[in-house]
Structure formats: C-alpha cells, structure tokens
Amino acid sequence: MLFRSCHGYKDSHIGMLPLAKMYADMKFNILLPDLHAHGLSDGDDIQMGWKDRDDVIRWIGVADTLFADSTGRQRIVLHGVSMGAATVMNVSGENLPQSVRCFIEDCGYTSVWDEFSHQLGEQFGLPPFPLLYAASALCKLRYGWSFGEASPLAQLTGKKSQMLFIHGTSDDYVPSAMVFPLYNANPKAQTEHGGVQRFNSIWITPGCAHAKSFHDYPAEYGRHVRAFLEEKGFFQ
C-alpha cells in the first residue's frame, strides 16, 4: 500500500511529514515528492495544481515500479492538502492505472478562478473584472491554461472518483462552502435494492481554520481516514 502526498501552496514535502507518520503507522509505503516550483523540484512558477497533475501521474508510474508487491500489484491513495488537494482532484479526473484506488482532499478549492476571485475580494476589496480576466489571459498565453480551465470541480463532475472530502468550518482562505459542490459533483449510483450509494465521503471539522483539520483533530482525522480506506479495500 502506498500513500502519495500533495502539499499546499508554497509548502513542500516537509509539511506533509505529520500525515506521512499517520500513514506509516498504518503500514503504508510513503512517497513525498515536491510539486512544481516547490521544495526540491524544478520550475520557477507555481502552477496551482493544474499542470502539476501531469507530474503526479508520472510519479504514479514511478510508484508502481518501486512499490509493487511480489505479485506486481499496488494500491495507492493520493492525499492532498490545500493546493495539493486541488492537485489530487485534478488528477482524479484523468485516466489512471488501476493501482490508484482512492483520493483524499483536504480543503481544496473549486477552481483557480474561484480561489483567486475570493482572495482578490477578501484581501483587496476588488471585483474580478478587469484584473482577474487580464491575469487569466496572460496565464493562458504563458503557461497554456486559464484560471477557469484549472477546475477541480470540472474534473470531478460526472466521475466516479472514490474520494474523502475534508474541510474546516472556519476556513476563510479556501471557504468551506467550496467543499459542497465538489462533494456533490460526484454522481450517485443506485443500489440493487433501490437505495443510493455514494462513491465518496465528507467530513466537516468544527472550528478549523485553513489546513488545520489534522492539527486540531489528529485522532479523529486518523479514524476518518482509516475508515475510508477500509471501505475502499485497503488492509485486506
């Protein structure tokens, strides 16, 4: 079993070590690479989890080689926090090998546009027009993607991703309201008895600021993660 982490904005693999310890205690192998333009990775400009998804997919291939068991099989969970959570959601919308079993996103945003629009209003009291429109157009010219295009919500919509969503109620950096459209983007499936089966789960942490759910509720965090992983076939 493998835990592959995705850290947050201007963080590095170091910031994911507490989560790595939680997974190590559950007997997971650990892979802690840095995202583009962070830590020890190459690059000068942060890609907000959009182009990073391609790097993560390549790392999955590396992990399948390094950590497969004696039968060649592998079970991977991708777990991201903040921008890393957005990265994980972006990855979940791509065609992935069967070794990737599930995803955990902690306080990720619906899209780069939504997050930048929120920050522009909160920090500077400015509307999206014209600054955000101009910046998005420049990003498209320089990096090949726009702020609206970089959308975890779009990546999740209609996909049967096995995902645990975590968000704090007092998050004013990535508003907690963003988690609900993300959670509801995943389709429901009818059970054979006419009930409804969800492919994902959600845990809202009371009073937690941005990216503080594990810090504030370490034991509960571990229990929720383990229960989700057990449901998805780990530990068997």
Task: Report the location of each language-model feature.
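Short, small-residue-biased leader/transition segments that mark boundaries at the very start
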Residues: 1-2
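Short alpha-helix in the alpha/beta-hydrolase fold that links the catalytic acid
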Residues: 19, 152, 161, 175-188
